[in-house]
Amino acid sequence: MLVEKRQQMILKMLEEKKSVTVTEIKDALGISESTIRRDLTVLDSEGQLVKVFGGAIAINSNYNAKELSVSQKLRVNEEEKRRIAKNAAAMIEPTDFIYLDAGTTTGYMIDYIKQKDATFVTNAVAHAKKLAVSGFHVILVGGELKGTTEAVVGNEAILSIQNYNFTKGFFGTNGVSVRHGFTTPDPNEALVKKTALKQCNIKYILTDSEKFDNVSSVKFADFGEIHILTDK
C-alpha cells in the first residue's frame, strides 16, 4: 500500500472516530505496528493529528487519555524500564535528598539503589513501602490517594512537597514530545509533578523510547528542561 494512501486511510478513521489506537489501525489496514507509528509521527509533525501513547487523536477532538493501572503498566516494556532504572539508581550519592515520583520505572529503581545514607521523599505508596522494608530512610507525602496509579495527589501533597529542597528528582511521564513537552493524563498528578520539579536541583525523566512523540492530556514540563534517561 502506498504511503500517501495509507496515511489518508488513517486520517479517515480519525475523522470518523476522533481517536484511534495502533491496534485498530493494524486490524483495519493490515500493516505492521512499526509502520503505523512512523505514519503517526509524520502526520503529527505535519499537524494533521496528535500522536498519543498507543495511538492518535484528531486535532479538533476533546481528548482525555485513560490512565493505565499500575498492574497494567508493569507488563509493558519491563526489560527497557529496568535498564533505565538501573542507570538512574547509579546516579544517587550518599548525601542526596531525593524526590522519587510515582511510576513503574521509578519503582524499579529501588531494586538497584545502593546508597543507604540517602533520604527519599515520594508520593507513591508502593515506593515508600518498598524503600522502608529495604532499610532506606523514606518520607511519604500526605494527601489524596489515587487508585489507578497508587499516587498521592491534591493540595496537601503539593503543600508538603513545597517544604523540601531536593538534590535530585526522578520522574515518570506518559508522553515525550518536542512540541508538546512532557505530559500525563491526570491534571492532579501533573500539578504534583510540576511542584516537585520546581523543588529539585537536578531533575531526570525516566522513559522508554516508545513514549517518544506521544502526547497525553496535561503538560507538566517543557521539553529541554529536564535530563532524559531512556533505553536508546
Give a label for each model feature.
Residues T119-F120, K168:
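A residue-level structural signature of the nucleotidyltransferase/glycosyltransferase Rossmann-like core
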Residues G103:
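Glycine-rich N-terminal segment of FAD-binding domains in flavoprotein oxidoreductases
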Residues L2-K5, M9, E15-T23, A28, ...:
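HTH-adjacent hinge/linker in prokaryotic transcriptional regulators
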Residues L2-K5, L11-K12, T21-V22, K51, ...:
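Conserved phosphate- and dinucleotide-binding cores of soluble alpha/beta proteins
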